[in-house]
């Protein structure tokens, strides 16, 4: 009987150690800090995380450009940083790229 109790306790400890603490979880953009948005996680279904705005060369979604977005964002990427545009490249993907129309040369 005593051996069964020890096994039960060991099983409880083993299952309790397989957990993770997730920081930066959010529901909407207003819960995130400056320079971030609340985007869907690629790794955990149903989880949204405060994610940095897109930097030059990073993938983006052309329909995801408003900050703060008042509802739940449906994309895993944030809009591009303010000085960048979400542009389509020859390979068909969208990436953050400098807005050359507004550049000061």
Swiss-Prot record:
GO CC terms, sorted: extracellular region
Annotated signal peptide: 1-19
One Pfam family from the record: Prokineticin
Disulphide-bridged cysteine pairs: 26-38, 32-50, 37-78, 60-86, 80-96
Reported tissue expression: Highly expressed in liver and ovary and weakly expressed in testis and placenta. Expressed in mucosa and mesenchyme of embryonic gut during enteric nervous system development (at protein level). Predominantly expressed in kidney and liver. Also expressed in lung, ovary, placenta and testis. In fetal liver, is restricted to and highly expressed in hepatocytes. In adult kidney, expression is restricted to the endothelial tubule cells. In placenta, expressed throughout gestation.
Compartments where located: Secreted
Record's keyword terms, sorted: Angiogenesis, Disulfide bond, Growth factor, Mitogen, Secreted, Signal
Keyword Disulfide bond: yes
Family of this protein: Belongs to the AVIT (prokineticin) family.
Name the UniProt record assigns to this protein: Prokineticin-1
Native organism: Mus musculus
């Amino acid at each position: 009987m005593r051996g069964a109790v020890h096994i039960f306790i060991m099983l409880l400890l083993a299952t309790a150690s397989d957990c993770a603490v997730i920081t930066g979880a959010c529901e909407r953009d207003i819960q995130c800090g400056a320079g971030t948005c609340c985007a869907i996680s690629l790794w955990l279904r149903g989880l949204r995380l405060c994610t940095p705005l897109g930097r030059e060369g990073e993938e983006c979604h052309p329909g995801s450009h408003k900050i703060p977005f008042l509802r739940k964002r449906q994309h895993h990427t944030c809009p591009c940083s303010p000085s960048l545009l979400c542009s389509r490249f020859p390979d068909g993907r969208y990436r953050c790229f400098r807005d050359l129309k507004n550049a000061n040369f």
